[in-house]
Amino acid sequence: MKKMIAVAFTVCGMLTVSIVAQTTEPGQGSKTPPFKYVWGKAYYILPETTSDESGYFSMCEGLNGRIYVGTAKYCVNSYLVEFDPVSEKQRIAIDTHKVCGATGTGYAAQAKIHTRNYVGTSGRIYVGSKQGYRRGTNDTASYPGGYVMVYDPVKDEAKCLGMPYPELGVIDVSADEARKLLYVTTCETQNWMIAKIDDLKYRKIGPMLFGYATTLIDGKGRGHAITREFNLATYDPEKDEVKVQTIKSPDGKSLFLEGSAGIPNWIIAPDGRTAYLLRLGEATLFSLDLQAEGESVTAKPLGTMVAGENPDSRGALTMGPDGLVYAIVKINNKTGFGTGSLHVLSRFDPKSSRIEELGVIAVKNKDFFDFEKAKAAGKSWIHGYHTLPDGTLTPLHCHMAMVAAKDGTLYVTILYPFTLLRIDAYRTEGLNVTK
């Protein structure tokens, strides 16, 4: 068994540690990779719920310990799938068309659940639907608009909560159940909207938002979102007003990055005021004080989560029960050990300001999907993995969502085929699942 070698270096004034060797694990051959693996068990998400083996940022852990994943079935429908970590069984929790009474096909279909699933204090799970893509020149259908939906795991009941904005999909839903408020972001035009849960009368409340913007609700009950100019918009429900603060780096510069590179992914800490932010096209982790006063708020750089070329992090940012911030970043594989890309898991410790690269995520049960059989059958959309020189199966193109469960288990979604990967290495107790 080989020893792990920790190489420490400083990024943005913070200590970063990379683990560059590995112990013996399943899947290794005679060759030794120059990095450690983080092993996960893969589960093929119900194939009848997708068309192109894909889903997006939509994943959460319910209060019952089960995992809920949104899927995309272009031109047809979308679904919320429930995964039970104990039985390892899956089932459909939401059939969007059935719940909302939708009948559209092609571009008119409710083809994606793309929202980051929001779990209310009641345990109810809030999601939204949006359009997919046109398939061919004959698809001239108009998209009617997306719906907000809620699923109650206790009652096993889903409800439609209306269409916030005709002809626009829903890219984010957050619920302040204490104040009976729903926050919604639309797409492809990013309107920031609000409604009372009791009457579902949606209205715009503030400036236009950045692409794929999400709402964080702080400890004071205020909603926060990133504007189109990459500033901080804060809605105070007591005053029914929005305040915008400029987001600046410590040297006074704007954090604005144009286009998809700047897409923000952020989470809020248990203190109800600290937000951690990671953008799609870079690997720098920032913290923001959502309760800061004044005309601007400082985005403090905490360091580089994963060092490498062409960083790409999707919805893979989460906080574990240990208080650590976990992230996955895809980088170009420049190690000489295989080609393509590597999806690296890292974590940040707020107490020590230390970043640790934990390793490349890898699949320990390579037989979870029969790639050769699918290829022989002419199946498309199965190109999302590659095999490294030691025989290890690892993601190639796209990771999407990541959540940390209450027991410390990490769950990651991967495209092509659409996969749920369960990482047990950081679990602190038995699987946390209730009936």
Model-flagged regions — what are they?
Residues 43-48, 93-109, 162-169, 209, ...:
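Surface-exposed loop and turn segments in beta-propeller and other repeat-based domains
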Residues 277, 283, 308-382, 386:
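Loop/turn-rich, solvent-exposed surfaces of beta-rich toroidal or solenoidal domains
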Residues 45-78:
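Beta-strand-rich domains and repeat architectures in extracellular enzymes and scaffolds
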Residues 61-64, 119-122, 175-179, 217-220, ...:
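Residue-level detector of Asp-centered blade-edge/turn motifs that repeat once per structural unit
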Residues 53-58, 101-117, 167-174, 208-220, ...:
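Repeated scaffold domains used in trafficking and secretory/extracellular systems
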Residues 88-122, 127-132, 164-165:
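Blade-loop segments of beta-propeller domains
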Residues 390-435:
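Blade-level signature of beta-propeller repeat domains, shared across WD40, Kelch, NHL, RCC1
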Residues 127-145, 328-343:
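Short, conserved, GDST-rich strand-edge loop motifs in beta-rich repeat architectures
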